[in-house]
């Protein structure tokens, strides 16, 4: 392959090299006076941007992108995480690197399948492989609250002696309805039952980002003392540094990105004196 072609393609794909958010895996196949692209890209916007860059770099070349597979096309379909916690893996295997752990109710866009694994996009743009059996086609119940404790147990009846239906982790969205005997009925993508309302927080909390919410984040942070470090973890079973920061903000009603470098890029400088939260 001509070195000039390889360089042009590499430069055209360079802006889409972060595999956490992009797919741009292309090769050039010469034929019939044209330069044919094959491979896969995440979406039409990626393919369009690559084609523009190639045409600018090699204006006399005739390009054909008809064989490129666009993942976010008509075949993509929405699904929902239907277990309390699952992995977003770099490869279609539990033995590969874990990138994150979506909770019950997380929206998933399935882009392609490989046996019992699917390559998926989360609603925050992260990409990875997920175990197909832990997803379902039905959307999660429309949430009104999120789990505010490190974890809660959901019971089949409104008492602590009833069978446990499931365990839900901090930050999991749930739909809450009035229950009985001081309990509330909760519905999630991982199951429904009864829970203690003191362990839930409304999603429509309109309190300003003031000292009260900073104090809440400080209080929540202390609840995770002793939790083991787990690369890609997001729960009391194991959590990493950026997942911990994201979860504490989520519990305080603030959405921030998943990974530390993206969190840093999205932040702003603050000046001393620094305060907890």
Model-derived regions: residue spans:
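N-terminal targeting leaders
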Residues: 1-95, 99-101, 106, 132-137, ...
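Soluble non-cytosolic domains of exported or imported proteins
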Residues: 3, 212, 235-239
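...with weaker cross-activation on analogous glycine-rich loops/strands in unrelated enzymes
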Residues: 254-277
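Active-site nucleophilic cysteine motif
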Residues: 221, 233-252
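Short, structured beta-strand/loop micro-motifs enriched in basic residues and often containing a Trp
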Residues: 84-93, 149-159, 259-267
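Loop/turn positions that initiate beta-strands
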Residues: 105, 168-174, 276-277
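Boundary regions of SH3-family modules and the immediately adjacent low-complexity/disordered segments
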Residues: 24-25, 48-77, 93, 114, ...
């Amino acid at each position: 392959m001509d070195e000039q072609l390889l360089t042009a393609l590499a430069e055209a794909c360079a802006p889409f090299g972060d595999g956490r958010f992009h797919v741009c895996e292309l090769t050039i196949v010469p034929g019939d006076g044209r330069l044919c692209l094959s491979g896969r890209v995440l979406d039409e916007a990626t393919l369009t941007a690559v084609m523009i860059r190639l045409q600018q770099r090699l204006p006399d070349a005739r390009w054909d992108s008809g064989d490129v597979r666009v993942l976010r096309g008509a075949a993509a379909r929405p699904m929902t995480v239907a277990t309390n916690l699952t992995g977003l893996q770099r490869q279609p295997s539990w033995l590969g690197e874990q990138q994150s752990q979506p909770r019950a109710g997380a929206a998933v866009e399935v882009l392609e399948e490989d046996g019992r694994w699917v390559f998926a996009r989360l609603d925050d743009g992260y990409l990875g492989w997920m175990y197909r059996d832990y997803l379902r086609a039905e959307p999660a119940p429309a949430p009104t609250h999120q789990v505010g404790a490190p974890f809660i147990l959901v019971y089949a009846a409104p008492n602590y002696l009833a069978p446990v239906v499931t365990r839900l982790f901090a930050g999991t969205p749930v739909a809450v309805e009035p229950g009985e005997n001081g309990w509330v009925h909760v519905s999630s993508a991982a199951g429904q039952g009864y829970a203690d309302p003191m362990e839930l927080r409304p999603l429509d909390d309109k309190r300003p980002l003031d000292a009260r919410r900073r104090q809440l984040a400080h209080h929540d942070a202390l609840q995770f003392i002793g939790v083991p470090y787990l690369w890609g973890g997001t729960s009391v079973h194991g959590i990493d540094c950026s997942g911990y920061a994201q979860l504490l903000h989520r519990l305080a009603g603030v959405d921030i990105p998943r990974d530390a470098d993206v969190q840093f890029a999205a932040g702003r400088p603050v000046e001393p004196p620094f305060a907890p939260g």
